[in-house]
């Protein structure tokens, strides 16, 4: 392992991601990641929360046109709500759009009774996630004819930015909230790994409007962060020594065939490996740091000791070795005469 690689490979990485729906709803979930290095719970939690609330793409109504209405401060005959109240209700529409947009939806209704989102007519590329949403109430004999303009975007866009230059008379732009994520909260707790108790556990509660699931929303937010941070990496990924230097006759580093007894570890570390049935170095390097720390009586001091010894052989914890163990491992091990 190179010095550069140590900057990230020697940090403990989360190996458990638990996602649990809250109250049987597909819109709310608790997302838990652990263990994290101390301080990383706050760092990742805050970054993910900001991206979830501001940067995910979604669909929303950007403008409406109501038959017989010229501006948003009008009233509609036979409609109990005025136009501003109707607009407030429309802002609550949760939409899923399968195309770029913009698209049109229409609504025609007659009284008496309430008008809901289920009465809106749309193309096959738009879905309404909350059809029970009440838009307005009509009196006896009243009629309502509306047209909605739907677009894609992110975050919050004010009505002034939703008015095109060639907007016709009666075109009423509205504020749009495109984000499919409605609420995000998080907390950081201690996480235990083996004998070490000061790691972080990140717990997030993510609520969406149903157009995207909480699990997918978190995955998208993480992908956005990954893409944004890529620019700051100014070096090529170094190749691990273990992948470059392999024995001519073996499909892997020959040191993997040595027994852990040859590492001259402290009595405590050696006993921990023995109790965990780790015989060969090849068995050892496939263990992650988190797995090692879960070994009884195995602490950070023992972990650092093992990592240092492995590094001297060009090896490290968390390696993936194909076809291990070989069928004739005992015979191969006997052929290695030179001691470490």
Swiss-Prot record:
Spans through the membrane: none
Entries under SUPFAM superfamilies matching the protein: C-terminal domain of RNA polymerase alpha subunit (SSF47789), Insert subdomain of RNA polymerase alpha subunit (SSF56553), RBP11-like subunits of RNA polymerase (SSF55257)
Keyword Iron-sulfur: no
UniProt gene name: rpoA
This protein's record includes keyword Ribosomal protein: no
Functional description taken from the UniProt entry: DNA-dependent RNA polymerase catalyzes the transcription of DNA into RNA using the four ribonucleoside triphosphates as substrates.
GO biological process: DNA-templated transcription
Protein family: Belongs to the RNA polymerase alpha chain family.
Source organism: Rhodospirillum rubrum (strain ATCC 11170 / ATH 1.1.1 / DSM 467 / LMG 4362 / NCIMB 8255 / S1)
Catalytic reactions on record: RNA(n) + a ribonucleoside 5'-triphosphate = RNA(n+1) + diphosphate
EC main group: transferase
Quaternary state and interactors: Homodimer. The RNAP catalytic core consists of 2 alpha, 1 beta, 1 beta' and 1 omega subunit. When a sigma factor is associated with the core the holoenzyme is formed, which can initiate transcription.
Domain of life: Bacteria
A Pfam family assignment: RNA_pol_A_bac
One GO location term (cellular component): DNA-directed RNA polymerase complex
Sequence segments annotated as region (Alpha C-terminal domain (alpha-CTD)): 252-340
Protein name per its UniProtKB record: DNA-directed RNA polymerase subunit alpha
Region: Alpha N-terminal domain (alpha-NTD), residue numbers: 1-236
GO MF terms, alphabetically ordered: DNA binding; DNA-directed RNA polymerase activity; protein dimerization activity
NCBIfam families: PRK05182.1-2, PRK05182.2-5, rpoA
Keywords tagged on the record: DNA-directed RNA polymerase, Nucleotidyltransferase, Transcription, Transferase
Record's comment describing the protein's domains: The N-terminal domain is essential for RNAP assembly and basal transcription, whereas the C-terminal domain is involved in interaction with transcriptional regulators and with upstream promoter elements.
């Amino acid at each position: 392992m190179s010095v550069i690689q140590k900057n990230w490979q020697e940090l403990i990485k989360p190996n458990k991601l638990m996602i649990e729906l809250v109250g049987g709803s597909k819109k709310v979930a608790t997302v838990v990641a652990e263990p994290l290095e101390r301080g990383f719970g706050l760092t990742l939690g805050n970054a993910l929360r900001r991206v979830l609330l501001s940067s995910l793409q979604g669909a929303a109504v950007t403008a409406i046109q109501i038959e017989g209405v010229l501006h948003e401060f009008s009233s509609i005959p036979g409609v109990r709500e005025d136009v501003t109240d109707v607009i407030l209700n429309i802002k609550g529409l949760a939409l899923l759009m399968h195309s770029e947009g913009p698209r049109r939806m229409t609504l025609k209704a007659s009284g008496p009774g309430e008008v809901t989102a289920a009465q809106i007519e749309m193309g096959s590329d738009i879905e309404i996630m909350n059809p029970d949403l009440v838009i307005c109430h009509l009196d006896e004999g009243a009629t309502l004819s509306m047209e909605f303009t739907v677009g894609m975007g992110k975050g919050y866009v004010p009505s002034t930015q939703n008015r095109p230059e060639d907007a016709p008379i009666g075109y009423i732009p509205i504020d749009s909230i495109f984000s499919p994520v409605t609420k995000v909260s998080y907390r950081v707790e201690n996480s235990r790994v083996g004998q070490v108790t000061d790691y972080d556990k990140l717990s997030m509660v993510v609520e969406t409007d149903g157009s995207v699931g909480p699990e997918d929303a978190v995955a998208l937010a993480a992908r956005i962060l990954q893409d944004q941070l890529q620019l700051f990496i100014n070096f090529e990924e170094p190749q691990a020594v273990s992948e470059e230097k392999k024995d001519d006759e073996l499909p892997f580093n020959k040191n993997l065939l040595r027994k852990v007894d040859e590492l001259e570890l402290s009595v405590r570390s050696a006993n921990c490996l023995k109790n965990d049935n780790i015989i060969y170095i090849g068995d050892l390097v496939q263990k992650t740091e988190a797995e090692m720390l879960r070994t009884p009586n195995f602490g950070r001091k023992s972990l650092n000791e093992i990592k240092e010894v492995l590094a001297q052989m060009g090896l490290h914890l968390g390696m993936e070795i194909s076809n291990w163990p070989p069928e004739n491992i005992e015979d191969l091990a006997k052929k290695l005469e030179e001691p470490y």
